[in-house]
């Protein structure tokens, strides 16, 4: 079973991702949801995800900083940045920090 962490301060985004994952993978995946970067880090410690989808712009700690801390806890976590920011510098920084990909919202089902 894969554990997937979803972190975004917009509930509609996490709800949609959760729905897509559950419909596509059923019992093969378990999800946990965070509404802030700090909560994502806390969940990463206890939930120990295999995969994480992180928004960049969240209250408190942003997704890039959260990714850095999460990968410090477990370098094997596959992190995908999910954002509305079409910013080359953000994308470059995300990849430098170890993100698997930089996905632009809205993300279609096939990308997940």
Please provide the spans of the model-predicted regions.
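Short hydrophobic/Thr-rich beta-strand motif most characteristic of the beta2 strand and flanking loop
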Residues: 25-35, 43, 91
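Generic detector of well-ordered alpha-helical packing
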Residues: 9-11, 56
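Non-catalytic signal-transmission and effector/linker regions of two-component phosphorelay proteins
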Residues: 1-3
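CheY-like receiver
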Residues: 41-112
């Amino acid at each position: 079973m894969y554990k997937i962490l979803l972190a975004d301060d917009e509930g509609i985004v996490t709800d949609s991702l959760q729905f897509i994952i559950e419909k596509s993978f059923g019992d093969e995946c378990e999800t946990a949801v965070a509404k802030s970067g700090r909560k994502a880090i806390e969940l990463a410690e206890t939930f120990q995800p295999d995969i994480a989808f992180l928004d960049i712009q969240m209250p408190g700690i942003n997704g890039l900083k959260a990714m850095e801390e999460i990968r410090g806890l477990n370098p094997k976590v596959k992190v995908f940045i999910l954002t509305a920011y079409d910013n080359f510098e953000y994308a470059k920084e995300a990849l430098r920090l170890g993100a698997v990909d930089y996905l632009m919202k809205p993300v279609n089902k096939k990308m997940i």
